[in-house]
Every structure is written in structure tokens, then in C-alpha cells.
Amino acid sequence: MNLAEICDNAKKGREYALLGNYDSSMVYYQGVIQQIQRHCQSVRDPAVKGKWQQVRQELLEEYEQVKSIVSTLESFKIDKPPDFPVSCQDEPVRDPAVWPPPVPAEHRAPPQIRRSNREVRPLRKDMAGVGARGPVGRAHPISKSEKPSTSRDKDNRARGKDDKGRKNMQDGASDGEIPKFDGAGYDKDLIEALERDIVSRNPSIHWDDIADLEEAKKLLREAVVLPMWMPDFFKGIRRPWKGVLMVGPPGTGKTMLAKAVATECGTTFFNVSSSTLTSKYRGESEKLVRLLFEMARFYAPTTIFIDEIDSICSRRGTSDEHEASRRVKSELLIQMDGVGGALENDDPSKMVMVLAATNFPWDIDEALRRRLEKRIYIPLPTAKGRAELLKINLREVELDPDIQLEDIAEKIEGYSGADITNVCRDASLMAMRRRINGLSPEEIRALSKEELQMPVTKGDFELALKKIAKSVSAADLEKYEKWMVEFGSA
């Protein structure tokens, strides 16, 4: 125990008390009292130990005096009505031709609302219901019997709420409620920022909503879905894959595959981007990465989807790499290496699976590529997949009887899934554009819904294809295929 540190803390506590900074003074007093208590436990000589206990008692008395000062100052902040009525005889004689002075409004402190740690923010409909019960901003008056709360009462209430929150978190699963993550040691703002990135515990995207990509669906079922159904089988060398990397051109359905994985498994789905894990403050980005994986293990089974992972974990050792970026990459690699929730002694149903997507696989760091054990190629849709995409995108639109989706699917060869969706959207708007051509705004507003619900024709698709070109070139496809031949692991 450093005796100089004890003396320094006691000196600072007294100085802050003299300067009127009572909060800081109480912190130093608490720290030095705890230090003396620990030091007394290590002292063997009874005489020396008695002197230290006497010093501790004196500091406790000073600490209580500071607390009483704080309590007195807080009691001054509470408005109290006068103890005796104002006599009418003291008022000056009023002139009837002059307006009397306004009556001063009575200021009352708002009632203190106790909130538990597990309280979640209400939805919009809940907020509307609260507003319907009574006028907003009208607080109930405080009765005279209520006593002003002191700092000691606040500490006791806060301590009681923390204990209750921990107990509720442990019993949350048995009550059927979703337990709340206890982020002890982390900033509350960081936890709330990551909780906002929990897209949903059920994103409602199913395999049938994704056309084609049968090989990718099969691998993702094997990596995520089957370990949930057969936990006894996926043990030892058969443990589930720790990470899956989806490689392919933009707009081929990588994000929808990740959401379908979370839906089919019923897992908590974290949608993470580079902006989520970066901060301008030194060391906070590494904290965010570590906190993300701790929350994922708490809410397990979990799917962490990192979109555009090349922007977070690009190749290390380059000349233009910043030192802060290197620390974030190192923390991400460390957390991913220890994220295997289905190792020999762990429950596969409590696993955390990292699902990543990128359009630039050649920029990814080698160590990250090793941790993402499965690397699959998400190609452009085939002829069958293009026809299925047309049916999915046009299922809410009326089609002309003469239109053949198979013929249109042949014409859009080389288009990605996003390109096909844009073509369908543009073609479905062609009839509306023809109908409102030359009309004034008043005439457009007067149109009925039936006049705009016109079937989509083959000519509409031909016009849309003239306006929208494919976004992926043949050179890009060759580059992806070459990388998969060298580093693929399907």
C-alpha cells in the first residue's frame, strides 16, 4: 500500500471541500477510507493498527460533515410555501383605476418517477396512449408530507435499483421476457448505439423470398440452421463454422441471405457497418468491437452480419494504414478467434456466427480470410433465377396476358438482382406515366385508383431495358472468379 497516495487523497478531499467542490471531495474521501481499511487488514502491530483506525474514524466524521453540507444545499433547491399567511394589512392601498399586479405562479417540483434498469423505450402507439390519458405537461402537486430527498436516499435508491435490475436480468428468461444486457464497465451511450443495430430478432425474410442461389442456401443451412436442430451431432471436429464470407458483385442478394439466416434460425441479428465500429476518440473503437461480441454472446444464438467488411478489416502493413485502424483490426481478429460458441465443451445452440459480405475480397486481410472459414461466391442470377426474380418483384402488379417472363429473363442476362428489381419498378410505372402525360396537377389529383391500375405490357419492359443498363461488367466477373479459384472455400 502506497502511504503517500493515502496522504495525497486525504489532502485533495479536504482541499475540494474548502473550495466548495463537494462531489469531488466525497469521491476522494470514499477512496481514502477504503484504502485505509485495506491497509489496516495488512497491519499486524496492534498499536499501529489502532492509530490507523483512529485516522479512519476522523476521516469518516469529515466525510459525514461534507455529506450533511450537500444535503443542506439540496434542500435549498426545493420550493416551499411560506409557513405563515401574508396579512392583508401589510398590503398597500390599491388605486381602483390601476390594474393590480399579477399573482405570482406557484412553482412546484415535478414528481420523481422511478425507473427500473429493464425499462425499454415505449413504441409510438404506447406514447399515443399515454398522451390520451391526460393533458401533457400537467404535473401532480407534491404533498406537504413528502420530505426532500437527500444524496444518501438517492444512493440507496440507485443501489436498490441496480440490485433489482441484476435480479430481473437473471430471472428474465424464466419469466418469458427478453433479458437486458448488463454493460457494467461500458459507457451507456456505446451500449445504446449497438442495441440500435439489433435489426430484429425476426427479420421476416425467408428462403422463398430469395430466387436462385441454391448452393449458398445449402451451405448457410449447414453452417447455421443444422447446428440449431442437431446440437449433439455438431461437436468436436464437426463443430459449426465460425465465420462465412459471401463474395460477389453488388446487388446479388448477400444482405437478404444474411437476414434469411437470422429468420430461419430465430437468432438475434446484428447488422454492423464500419460506421458502427468507428469513433473519433482514442481506444473507443476497440471497446465497441469488444462490446459487440460480448452482447452477441449474451443474446446468443446470434448472427453478426458485417456488411462491406473490407472497409473495416483491409490488408494490414500497408504504407497508408493508420495506427488506430490497425488496433481496431487486431481487436476484431482477436474477438473472432474466440467467438466459437460451439467448441468441444460449449452448447452449439448458443453459438455466435459471423457472417460477412464484401465486393472487394482481394482487399481483405489474410488473417481475417483465415478466420472466415467458408468463403462462398454469390454469382449473378441464372436464367431460372432471373425468371423467379421477375415473378417475385411483379407478384403485386397486374400483368398483360401476352407477356412471357421467360423471354424477358433471356433479355436481361448479365443483370444483377438489384438491376432486375429496378427494371421491374420502372416498367410498372410506365402505364402511370402515359396516363398523366399532359395533365395538370388538379387533373392528376382527380384521377381514380382504377384508372392508374393498368397492366404491365411487354412494351413497358422494352422501354425500361433501354433506359437501365447492367451494373456489372465482364471484367469484374472474371476478377471474382479468379479470386474464388485461388481462395474459395465452398
From Swiss-Prot:
GO terms for cellular component: centrosome; cytoplasm; microtubule; spindle; spindle pole. This is Katanin p60 ATPase-containing subunit A-like 1. It holds the Pfam family KATNA1_MIT. It catalyses: n ATP + n H2O + a microtubule = n ADP + n phosphate + (n+1) alpha/beta tubulin heterodimers. Residues 128-139 have a biased composition (Low complexity). The lineage of its organism: Eukaryota, Metazoa, Chordata, Craniata, Vertebrata. InterPro entries: AAA+_ATPase, AAA_lid_3, ATPase_AAA_core, ATPase_AAA_CS, KATNA1, KATNA1_MIT, Katnal1_chordates, KTNA1_AAA_dom. Keywords: Acetylation, ATP-binding, Cytoplasm, Cytoskeleton, Isomerase, Microtubule, Nucleotide-binding, Phosphoprotein. It comes from Otolemur garnettii (Small-eared galago). Belongs to the AAA ATPase family. Katanin p60 subunit A1 subfamily. A-like 1 sub-subfamily. Its EC number is 5.6.1.1. It is found in: Cytoplasm, Cytoskeleton; Cytoplasm; Cytoplasm, Cytoskeleton, Spindle pole; Cytoplasm, Cytoskeleton, Spindle. ATP binds at G248, P249, P250, G251, T252, G253, K254, T255. Its main location: cytoplasm. Residues 87-182 are annotated as: Disordered. SUPFAM superfamilies: P-loop containing nucleoside triphosphate hydrolases. Residues 116-127, 143-169 have a biased composition (Basic and acidic residues). One of its GO terms (biological process) is microtubule severing. The modification N-acetylmethionine is found at M1. The modification Phosphoserine is found at S174. Regulates microtubule dynamics in Sertoli cells, a process that is essential for spermiogenesis and male fertility. Severs microtubules in an ATP-dependent manner, promoting rapid reorganization of cellular microtubule arrays. Has microtubule-severing activity in vitro.
